Regions:
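C-terminal alpha-helical interaction appendages
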Residues: 1-73
């Protein structure tokens, strides 16, 4: 994976982890686990989707939908 892409993914992951902690009250390990085990994270990590160029807030909205409905809508 390209270093720049990896950097963007790590930044989004950091932001979403913080969003989960602030919005849902999760502790750090739980927030990381929820995101890393999500379909959203799998899509974010797939360079072919281009999701890594979107904002953290946009990716978080996708994750919230996944958590609510059990899959990406």
């Amino acid at each position: 994976m390209n270093k720049r892409v990896q950097y963007l993914i790590e930044g989004i992951t950091k932001d979403i982890t913080i969003y989960l902690m602030d919005d849902e009250g999760y502790e750090l390990p739980e927030a990381l686990s929820i995101f890393h085990n999500s379909e959203t994270f799998a899509k974010l990590s797939d360079e072919d989707t281009g999701l890594y160029i979107e904002s953290s807030a946009y990716v978080y909205e996708i994750l919230k939908g996944e958590l609510k409905y059990g899959k990406i809508q």
